[in-house]
Structure formats: C-alpha cells, structure tokens
Amino acid sequence: MVSVNENALPLVERMIERAELLNVEVQELENGTTVIDCGVEAAGGFEAGLLFSEVCMGGLATVELTEFEHDGLCLPAVQVTTDHPAVSTLAAQKAGWQVQVGDYFAMGSGPARALALKPKETYEEIDYEDDADVAILCLESSELPDEDVAEHVADECGVDPENLYLLVAPTASIVGSVQVSARVVETGLYKLLEVLEYDVTRVKYATGTAPIAPVADDDGEAMGRTNDCILYGGTVYLYVEGDDELPEVVEELPSEASEDYGKPFMKIFEEADYDFYKIDPGVFAPARVVVNDLSTGKTYTAGEINVDVLKESFGL
C-alpha cells in the first residue's frame, strides 16, 4: 500500500529547493520541524499553490492550471486528475483535522492525517493505513505554527519532530485560492461517502475543474468565495464500477440537490448563525457531475454551473 506521506515528500523537497522561485519561505523550528510559509508572510504564487495542492493529495494527483469561461465569466482554474481517488482525497486531502494548541488554530489536511487517523472512521471506510516515519501536514491558517504546535502534531502522528513538515497558507492568499479549488474532486468523494453513504472504493479514476477565486482581503470572505468556486463552478468526472444504485446516487450528488443551494456560501453561513453544523452537508459538492459506469458503459450527468451566484459572490 502506497504511503501518502512518503509519496508526497519529493514534492515537499522540491518546494524547499525552489523556495525563492516559488515565493515561499522555509524555516526550521528549534525542534527540527520544517515550516514552509506559502502565504502568511511569504507571497506565494500559482506554482506554489499547485504544489501545495499536490502535496495535500499525497502526491497521488496532478494539479494544473487551466481556464474557466462560462456565460461571460472568465477566470483561471485548476484541473485535478487522480487514479487513486479515495486515497488522494479522503485519506490525504480532506480537511479532517482541527489543530488547536493554546491560542493557535488551523484546519489540517494532507498526508499526516493518515498517521494520526483524523478521523479514524474515514480510514476504516476506505481501508487505508500509513506507517511512514515522516509526516506532512497542510495548515490553512493566517498564523505560522510554533514548536508547541509542531510537538503536538508530531506526537499525534507518532513521528519525531525533525521528520515533520508543515505547509501553511491563509485562505485569503493566492495559494489559499488555488488549494481550495483543487478540492473539487474531494468534495464529490466526500459527499458520496459521508452524505450518500456510497462505497467510494468503487470510484477508480477522477478528474475535475474549478475556477480559482479572486483573492479576498480577509479569510472570512475568502472562505465564502473559495467554497462557491466548487459549489457553483466545479465540474467533476468520475469513473465508477457501478451498481444498481448509481443512477439515483448521481442525481443526489451535485450541490443543487441540497436545500441550501442557490445563494453565496457566506449567505448560507450567515443564515446558519455561523454554525457549520446547521448547514446541510449535502451542499458541499461540485456544481456539476459526470459519471461513467465502467460496468455498463453508461454515462450519467447531473447539476449545472451557476454563474449568477459566482458573480454575486465575487461582487461582479
């Protein structure tokens, strides 16, 4: 079984070697942990965002720049492609670890989750485990972690602090915009497993595109814009060893199947009293899905791109 941590390490090493060209800053904490600043104090950039995203997916996907053009709205976009959908998205990329140490808080995603089993149920459902000696965690935060945070993460992962790598980017940064849009395939797999309770190991290949949100001036607004890029601008193509349930599952898969669909995410969040648990989890999904049943050769589609909500979200 491939290790998502060991597989992502060459990408991390490439980021360290090319730090100046990527506009990222590398520092070693006193306990030996390596921190790669991709947008807190460093500028970051598109290439750093693409690498950040590939690291987050355990090196089991390619993330490339493309273009989104729909009904007069033109934006840069990402194209995500993986031949290991369940592992790259749910075992690695999913933002399933709330890292809180003292006053520090970050959403943790990436390969290190597989060592810390955050959350354990996900790994049981997709039958995946990792036992690497190195841990790589991607943190969505506007603050850089210190030694206490690193010690906590290393301890949870069962690795020495000097074998821990922490990549950090705020939501309101170019790397933040890129890496959230690169979760377009992940949202499809997430909804299949967590909401529709479908066996995601049946998904054999996946690719998807989503526009990259204009960078906002604060993390709150950025959270809304980046989510909208997937909910209203994302398209995912899944290749599935299907069953009799698949046609009905596809109809429920896109974001439009949710009762919360149809308005910018920040409005949804506001109406939920800023409580994520009051939001219908079914809205966290791509706008449009195309599913090829490998067992029958049939193809099913559902959902559509909603440019009007994207424009409202971006203030256009």
UniProtKB/Swiss-Prot annotation:
EC number: 3.5.4.27
Coiled-coil segments: none
Protein localization: Cytoplasm
Keyword Cytoplasm: yes
Keywords from the named record: Cytoplasm, Hydrolase, Methanogenesis, One-carbon metabolism
Enzyme class per UniProt: hydrolase
GO CC annotations on file: cytoplasm
Gene Ontology BP, a term: methanogenesis, from carbon dioxide
Gene Ontology terms, MF aspect: methenyltetrahydromethanopterin cyclohydrolase activity
Reactions catalysed, as given in the entry: 5,10-methenyl-5,6,7,8-tetrahydromethanopterin + H2O = N(5)-formyl-5,6,7,8-tetrahydromethanopterin + H(+)
Subunit structure: Homotrimer.
Matching NCBIfam families: one_C_mch
Family to which this protein belongs: Belongs to the MCH family.
Role, per record: Catalyzes the reversible interconversion of 5-formyl-H(4)MPT to methenyl-H(4)MPT(+).
Name recorded for this polypeptide: Methenyltetrahydromethanopterin cyclohydrolase
Species whose genome carries this gene: Methanopyrus kandleri (strain AV19 / DSM 6324 / JCM 9639 / NBRC 100938)
